[in-house]
């Protein structure tokens, strides 16, 4: 993880740790001129590692985004941001996207009252995301919400921390996407 962060820069979804300031300078000095291929590859790898995707999953999302109306890049980022694991991360119910994936895989999360155990589940506007009524599930989410720094919540999400409930209001606006892609 730390090698990826050092190579690609800060990836907020992967871990809360940041690369040291000196390591970035060393990489720039050593790297020389960056080709177009290298720039594109690094941006693709940023997407993959930030959202925890395989190569095949990313290609599928690119294919869907290419067919949709509008800018392919913006549509791609909207698709990725509307994944259940990413929405849990944005709501503050998990400290990282891999942590959110684990919550979903272990069946702690309900969407519209139904257990969803697929992290790539695509959330839609007006979806209600809650935790199971079990004490263990509520304790996990409570710890994450209490320990996470209260960052500003994106406009497309609302959270009720006392009921452990999140609501997807609309599709994400491009200014709220936390990852800087070239």
Swiss-Prot record:
Keyword Plastid part of the UniProt annotation: yes
Which compartments is it annotated to reside in?
A: Plastid, Chloroplast
The entry describes its oligomerization and partners as:
Part of the 30S ribosomal subunit. Contacts protein S5. The interaction surface between S4 and S5 is involved in control of translational fidelity.
Q: What is its main location?
A: plastid
Instruction: List the PANTHER family.
Output: 30S 40S RIBOSOMAL PROTEIN (PTHR11831), SMALL RIBOSOMAL SUBUNIT PROTEIN US4M (PTHR11831:SF4)
Q: Name one GO cellular component term.
A: chloroplast
Q: Which organism is it from?
A: Isophysis tasmanica
Q: GO MF terms on file? A: rRNA binding; structural constituent of ribosome
Stated name of the protein:
Small ribosomal subunit protein uS4c
Q: Which lineage?
A: Eukaryota, Viridiplantae, Streptophyta, Embryophyta, Tracheophyta
The S4 RNA-binding domain is annotated at: 82-143
